[in-house]
């Protein structure tokens, strides 16, 4: 049975890998738990598109990481517009995907949302914040941004 993994499975592969497994293992374990989908031509094309888009966001090597770090730390006008109530309290909280979108709007590099390290307590008020962005092992960049009211 030919499957495409959607999550990492020990001794089998990582998300996006096309694997050949026994029919019972696929039907009774991988498919019901959502670890894989059946490999069809459409699904294979979709996986290749996702992998191509992910490759655009990946930091390739140490030199590229240093260039991205310099670019991130040079950004000064990163603003995350959100809807707020009176007193600057947010409806919800700021997520790492919101920060990535704001960086791209400000002209910064494309980042993976999993590389953003948000504070332990979530961001629920307007103001200035700083987060760490993990580029490669051992290298992080400091990113400062402002959470502002979208209506103003």
UniProtKB/Swiss-Prot annotation:
Keywords: Ribonucleoprotein, Ribosomal protein, RNA-binding, rRNA-binding. One of its GO terms (cellular component) is ribonucleoprotein complex. GO terms for biological process: translation. GO terms for molecular function: rRNA binding; structural constituent of ribosome. InterPro entries: Ribosomal_bL9 (IPR000244), Ribosomal_bL9/RNase_H1_N (IPR009027), Ribosomal_bL9_bac/chp (IPR020594), Ribosomal_bL9_C (IPR020069), Ribosomal_bL9_C_sf (IPR036791), Ribosomal_bL9_N (IPR020070), Ribosomal_bL9_N_sf (IPR036935). It comes from the Bacteria. Belongs to the bacterial ribosomal protein bL9 family. Binds to the 23S rRNA. This is Large ribosomal subunit protein bL9. The gene is rplI.
